[in-house]
Amino acid sequence: MSRVGRFIFSIAGLLVIAGASATVRADTVFVSGAGSGQFSTATVVCEFNSQTNTFTFTITNTSAITQPGSTSTITGIGYDLPPVGNASASGLNGFTGMQAPSLSSNFVFSDGDLGNVPHGFDTAVLDFGFTTGASGNFAGGSVNDGLLPGESASFIVSGAAFTGFTEEQICNAIFVRFQNVPLAGGSNGSDVGVVGAIPEPSTIFLLGTALLGAGGFARRRLRKRK
């Protein structure tokens, strides 16, 4: 094969690889408080690899963006895979998980009984989750170890029990526990957030701008530390 032929073949190969990579995408879901609404919000970017049964997600506390001044802090994250509920208090079993290293929050993974989901979700049974504080249950939690407004954290979960579920089903099965919710939110100081409607375009623009700003700030901090 001539040089030109090899060059064209190489370019074609790169285009095929690039095209295949472009088809891989993560889902984004928007969480809002069941009782406090825009006082307690989060954006979750999630991705599921069905070949390895591995689920990864990054959650950002956007409460102070959707409601300036909000102090709502994420202290627990749980998933109840469909259908809602389970005969066992621990739901589906066989999952393992961990939080990516973080300087701002400290979540602990659990595949056991995470307790009830308050604020109107009594029928939910969490299959796995991440909690803060000594209680080890979803309804409790430690504000000091949680995710403050503007902060993000990443997690990974794997397990054969994911078999048969789609990325969309898993992403939408999230429950987020908020503590230190402003009383003006109307939920008596705490709340649980679930996936809701897509925010208005103006809100999405603000979220995107804020997340980009946070990323730039983090990169500047890393450069300074180096």
Protein language model regions, located:
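Compositionally biased, low-complexity segments enriched in small residues
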Residues: V4, G19, I198-P199, F205
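Sec/Tat signal peptide C-region and signal peptidase I cleavage site
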Residues: A20-A26
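Short A/G/S/P-biased low-complexity tracts
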Residues: A26, A218-R221
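Mature extracellular "passenger" or substrate-interacting domains of secreted, surface-exposed proteins
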Residues: D27-A197
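Short, charged juxtamembrane terminal tails flanking transmembrane helices
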Residues: R223-K226
